[in-house]
Amino acid sequence: MAGHSKWANTKHRKERADHKKGKIFSRIIKELISAVKLGGADPKSNARLRMVIQKAKENNIPNENIERNLKKATSAEQKNFEEVTYELYGHGGVGIIVEAMTDNKNRTASDMRIAINKRGGSLVEPGSVLYNFARKGACTVAKSSIDEEVIFSYAIEAGAEDLDTEDEENFLVICAPSELASVKEKLISQGATCSEDRLIYLPLRLVDCDEKDGEANLALIDWLEQIEDVDDVYHNMS
């Protein structure tokens, strides 16, 4: 999620939006496998699995894909997925947070080191970058499903803190993490199509970059986003 960066031009935003669609599919499948590993393959007795299956259907993942991965998740050969967070500083003092979901932390760590060796930056101790960000809930809403003035009114009434534009096709409704489920439910009740709800990081302060550092950071972020296990990359570049 690039945020409001002067470096994120239209072409870059479009490429990232297209790439993000594939990431959503991949993340849901990993969440499904993790839910089965933790609570079993029966959605009737596994509330977490029920929620993930519903999310999969909302994102038009075919039933055969869901069934195939449910079967895959019950295999002893399939490892569980773990959530991992990496903090690093990019060029010009920009903070970057990388969230990944992986079944092999050594592989993911190796991919992170390769990205940094190729594009610069430095991994730092946990907490060194996080304090520059706030944890928020976010709901992606299709612009085609609801008018901007209407969604703003409903979102604020539902408990949202802000309404943003995620890309050309979607709004992004921001709220406190504890309000995410309630906000999503109320928006859906008003006809909005919510394709994804998740927790994100929003920068509390922005770092201004010169052109050289800005372009170098974009190259680093693009590389990080291409890592298979990585789900989201956040930064505080203005």
Curated annotation (Swiss-Prot):
An example Gene Ontology CC term for this record: cytosol
Location of the region described as Disordered in the Swiss-Prot/TrEMBL record: 1-20
Pfam families linked to this entry = TACO1_YebC_N (PF20772), Transcrip_reg (PF01709)
Q: Does the keyword Transmembrane apply?
A: no
Q: Does the keyword Translocase apply?
A: no
Q: Indicate the family of this protein.
A: Belongs to the TACO1 family.
Q: What is the official name of this protein in its record?
A: Probable transcriptional regulatory protein CPn_0573/CP_0176/CPj0573/CpB0595
Q: Which organism is it from?
A: Chlamydia pneumoniae
